[in-house]
């Protein structure tokens, strides 16, 4: 059957490496090494006064009170020569938070390839009979992290166009491409309601243009004072249960609304009070068994396209004895090169874990975390990364069982910079201060008005007590790779400390700050305990 052509995830915005704009979705372009700039004397002269001043400045920044009691691994390298320009605790094993996604993305490009795409099929045992009937129907997922409700509707239309009018038996959601382990063993149970801790499945429906997997958008609207608030479960309407105890408070009263999914349930619980004059409140919340939600949505799509399902909707794999199953519809995702943009720009945990399990399928025929993480480490070793200081427990960095060193992160950055997929890798990284979220990502609101704006390309990482920023500073005087990994701070994440270092590196690489925006000496303030994209703050 002819496969549908994938649509670009976003229009492309052009710009060279280190320019003011970064591609949001890729087209065919020449792949250029990231180390084309030779080392200028200003960068290469390790005995120069400029380098001494740089080291002193970074030392001063790291004295900030925000880092009291913390351990910080900081390494800066000239990518052209491999020369280490700065190092503090570079060999210390630390939690990486979402900097783990750098390793996952590199392994996915190495194992799957930048042109890899993910398929979803609709299968029956045979073609429809004269009455347009088939017995059972299977919606088969193979790890597409961007499958949307619109894609399901398009496949339902294909099923109808194939002549199917009635499914006499059941509709099954087949997610057996991956195993049935939904969550990493040490992820915190209290995180389960939130989009950054969604269940992982080979068949999941992505929400919105950022492709959040395994979630639904819950909307709460005030009614008349004293009346229950109105709750819309979005895509999960009719699939998840609703426990609505939220009330409408007086105009101007406090908003105490809480939207939860209690652990082990498929119930959205809404409590608290929403003022009568408040705007509607929306929040992404996870669902139990994302594949079952996909099946529910596909049944609705079939009904909308004139196909009736007589039986139930459930989970199940295509029978092994269906040697010549009839594929009635299919969908092919965009290529990995494009999928990496929402994955890395918005630090999407669901994408990371689906990629790990896809790597496991590719390397070992097993869509499991165990197989996938072995595949990730082997790919990194094959790339030339020294993995001795690396401990992998998931692909996203949400696990507190992961360990990296700043040395290893910078090693990865250097090896990735000379890989055939270097341009694809670069295009996926957030760019400092760029207001377009598909360019700036989690750095969209950071380092604006500084020498780093539109220049620094780096992956963020933040969760309680852990924060990191690692990436590149290209410039007219050469290119730097850097990693900053902070662990053990007791207050908010020291984002401004990281930003001050990145700005100083941009200045060192030859960029000029706008008038009045030079780096300020002395204390800087941090903020946030989670990635800004996880809480819809960027």
Curated annotation (Swiss-Prot):
Removes C-terminal D-alanyl residues from sugar-peptide cell wall precursors. Residues 146-319 are annotated as: Absent in class-A beta-lactamases. Pathway: Cell wall biogenesis; peptidoglycan biosynthesis. The gene is dac. The keyword Disulfide bond does not apply. SUPFAM superfamilies: beta-lactamase/transpeptidase-like (SSF56601). Inhibited by benzylpenicillin, cephaloridine, ampicillin and cetiofur. PANTHER family: D-ALANYL-D-ALANINE CARBOXYPEPTIDASE, PENICILLIN-SENSITIVE CARBOXYPEPTIDASE A. It comes from Actinomadura sp. (strain R39). Residues 1-21 are annotated as: Disordered. Belongs to the peptidase S13 family. Residues 516-538 form a propeptide. It comes from the Bacteria. The keyword Secreted applies. This is D-alanyl-D-alanine carboxypeptidase. Substrate binds at residue 459. It is found in: Secreted. GO terms for cellular component: extracellular region.
């Amino acid at each position: 059957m002819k496969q549908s052509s994938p649509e670009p995830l976003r229009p492309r915005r052009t710009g060279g490496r280190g320019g003011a704009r970064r591609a949001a979705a890729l087209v065919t372009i020449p792949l250029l090494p990231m180390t084309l700039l030779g080392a200028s004397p200003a960068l290469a002269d390790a005995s120069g006064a400029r380098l001494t001043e740089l080291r002193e400045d970074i030392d001063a920044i790291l004295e900030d009170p925000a880092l009291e009691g913390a351990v910080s691994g900081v390494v800066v390298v000239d990518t052209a020569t491999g020369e280490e320009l700065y190092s503090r605790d570079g060999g210390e094993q630390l939690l990486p938070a979402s900097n783990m996604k750098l390793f996952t993305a590199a392994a996915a490009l190495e194992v799957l390839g930048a042109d890899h795409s993910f398929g979803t099929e609709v299968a029956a045992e045979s073609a429809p009979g004269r009455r347009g009937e088939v017995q059972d129907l299977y919606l088969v997922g193979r790890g597409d992290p961007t499958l949307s409700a619109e894609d399901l509707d398009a496949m339902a239309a294909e099923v109808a166009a194939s002549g199917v009018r009635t499914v006499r038996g059941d509709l099954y959601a087949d997610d057996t491409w991956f195993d049935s382990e939904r969550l990493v063993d040490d992820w915190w149970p209290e995180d389960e309601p939130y989009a950054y801790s969604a269940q992982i499945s080979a068949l999941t429906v992505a929400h919105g243009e950022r492709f959040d997997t395994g979630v639904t958008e819950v909307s709460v609207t005030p009614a008349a004072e004293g009346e229950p608030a109105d709750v819309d479960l979005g895509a999960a309407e009719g699939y998840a249960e609703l426990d609505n105890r939220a009330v409408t408070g007086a105009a101007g009263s406090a908003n105490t609304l809480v939207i939860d999914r209690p652990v082990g349930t498929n119930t959205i619980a809404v409590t608290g009070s929403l003022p009568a004059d408040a705007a509607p409140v929306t929040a992404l919340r996870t669902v139990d068994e994302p594949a079952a939600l996909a099946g529910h949505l596909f049944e609705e799509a079939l009904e909308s396209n004139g196909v009736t399902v007589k039986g139930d909707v459930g989970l199940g794999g295509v029978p092994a004895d269906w040697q010549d199953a009839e594929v009635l519809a299919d969908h092919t995702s965009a290529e990995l090169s494009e999928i990496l943009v929402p994955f890395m720009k918005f630090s999407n945990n669901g994408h990371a874990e689906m990629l790990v399990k896809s790597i496991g399928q590719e390397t070992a025929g097993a869509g499991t975390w165990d197989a996938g993480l072995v595949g990730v480490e082997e790919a990194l070793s094959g790339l030339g990364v020294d993995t001795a200081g690396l401990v992998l427990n998931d692909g996203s960095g949400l696990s507190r069982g992961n360990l990296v060193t700043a040395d290893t992160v910078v090693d990865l950055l250097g090896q990735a910079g000379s890989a055939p997929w270097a341009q694809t890798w670069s295009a996926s990284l957030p760019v400092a201060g760029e207001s377009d979220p598909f360019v700036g990502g989690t750095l969209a609101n950071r380092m604006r008005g500084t020498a780093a704006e539109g220049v620094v390309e780096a992956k963020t990482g933040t969760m309680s007590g852990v924060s990191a920023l690692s990436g590149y500073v290209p410039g007219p005087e050469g290119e730097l790779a850097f990693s900053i990994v902070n662990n053990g701070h007791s207050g908010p994440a020291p984002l401004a400390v990281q930003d001050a270092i990145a700005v100083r590196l941009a200045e060192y690489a030859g960029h000029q700050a706008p008038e009045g925006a030079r780096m300020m000496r002395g204390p800087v303030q941090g903020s946030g305990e989670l990635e800004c994209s996880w809480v819809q703050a960027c």
